Amino acid sequence: TDAPPTEPETTEEREISFDFIEIESETALLTDIDGNELYSKNQYSRIYPASLTKIMTAIVAIEHISDLDEQIMIPGDIYDQIAYENGSTAGFVAYECVTYRDMLYGAVLSSGAECCLTLASYISGSEWEFVELMNSKAKELGMSDTSFTNVCGFQNYEHYSTASDISLLLRYALENDTFYEIFTS
């Protein structure tokens, strides 16, 4: 055979240094795909998770929706709350009929508060009941320093997490095919 010789495969691990990185953020955590820590800065310090909350909102919703293509109507009464909190929207309008799938895309990709509030309303009957599901899921995942008070990430003293807990959540959520498809779109 005239095939060129092949190089032997190597499984040599390389050491990576992050000493040169200056992170402006108060907290940070970088892990590899398996969750092994590569870099951290105050990863256990409490933060307001803001729109990262929507990761939990989306994964809890996905786990409670049986038909992603079912149509639901956006309630009209949610827009006052969004305006009061200066929340972002995905651009849907009151009483518009859309699928659960569209609501999930709007929540994750556009950080749409109307999508999060609509999902919570249809799945649990109220935002508060949905938040209970979120906090139960956080405990189940071992997110030991996380507390949610709303589905959108609106700032509240009792709404907090850590970089470490958010990392746990994201690794879990990315294992779900639907979440992965939406998140990586």
State where each predicted segment sits.
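Active-site-adjacent loops and short helices of periplasmic peptidoglycan-processing enzymes
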Residues: 7-164, 173-174
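Extracytoplasmic
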Residues: 165-185
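Gram-positive cell-envelope targeting signals
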Residues: 1-6
